[in-house]
């Protein structure tokens, strides 16, 4: 039994707890997203629509967010691959690797960026750390001013680990997709034709 559990084994979460923490998450995401430099994001968005394929690479929850972004970019009509999938081809010159790491030091993500750079591909990165190895490899960097997952005593966020980074990463990638779509005359019905029909 954990300290959070009562003697009868039940955790006494009540509605007020949920209300308070919904407000916490909402406010932290809104405050942090407002601090992201929109010009950095615009540069990254322009990289996405340059000629070439788009590859995404991330670890853990950041990687899951990039998978969602990859889906939306596919709906938009781009050729998108997720690093590590069995059908993902080799990246090459002219392609874009979209990566995310809060610390900017995640070994597998940095290695992917190094490999892509050697192949002549462009790198676009999301991170909290502008001085990180990942940021140093990138042609376009978006700094998300959230706590790193190892910063357990941070005043930046009351949430656990890298939650705030991952939440804002999702919001920013959604804003990128929406902004790209806004600059087209493509109807939602056309995007819908690219949704998966094998489920």
Swiss-Prot record:
PANTHER family: 3-HEXULOSE-6-PHOSPHATE ISOMERASE (PTHR43443:SF1). This is 3-hexulose-6-phosphate isomerase. Pathway: One-carbon metabolism; formaldehyde assimilation via RuMP pathway; D-fructose 6-phosphate from D-ribulose 5-phosphate and formaldehyde: step 2/2. It comes from the Bacteria. It catalyses: D-arabino-hex-3-ulose 6-phosphate = beta-D-fructose 6-phosphate. Pfam families: SIS. CDD domains: SIS_PHI. Catalyzes the isomerization between 3-hexulose 6-phosphate and fructose 6-phosphate. Signal peptide: none annotated. PROSITE patterns: SIS (PS51464). Gene3D superfamilies: Glucose-6-phosphate isomerase like protein, domain 1. Belongs to the SIS family. PHI subfamily. The keyword Iron does not apply. GO terms for molecular function: 6-phospho-3-hexuloisomerase activity; carbohydrate derivative binding. It is an enzyme of class 5 (isomerase). Keywords: Carbohydrate metabolism, Isomerase. InterPro entries: PHI/rmpB, SIS_dom, SIS_dom_sf.
């Amino acid at each position: 039994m954990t300290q959070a559990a009562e003697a009868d084994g039940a955790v006494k979460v009540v509605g007020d707890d949920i209300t308070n923490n919904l407000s916490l998450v909402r406010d932290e995401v809104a405050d942090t997203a407002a601090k992201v430099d929109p010009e950095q994001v615009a540069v990254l968005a322009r990289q996405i629509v340059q000629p070439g394929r788009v590859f995404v690479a991330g670890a853990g929850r950041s990687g899951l967010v990039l998978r969602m972004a990859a889906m939306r970019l596919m709906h938009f009509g781009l050729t998108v691959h997720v690093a590590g999938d069995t059908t993902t081809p080799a990246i090459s010159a002219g392609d874009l690797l979209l990566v995310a790491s809060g610390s900017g030091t995640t070994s597998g993500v940095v290695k992917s960026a190094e490999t892509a750079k050697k192949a002549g591909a462009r790198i676009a990165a999301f991170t909290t750390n502008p001085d990180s190895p990942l940021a140093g490899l990138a042609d376009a960097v978006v700094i998300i001013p959230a706590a790193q997952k190892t910063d357990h005593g941070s005043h930046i966020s009351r949430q656990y680990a890298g939650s705030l980074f991952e939440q804002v990463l999702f919001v920013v990638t959604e804003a990128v997709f929406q902004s790209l779509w806004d600059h087209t005359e493509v109807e939602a019905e056309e995007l819908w034709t690219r949704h998966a029909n094998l489920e």
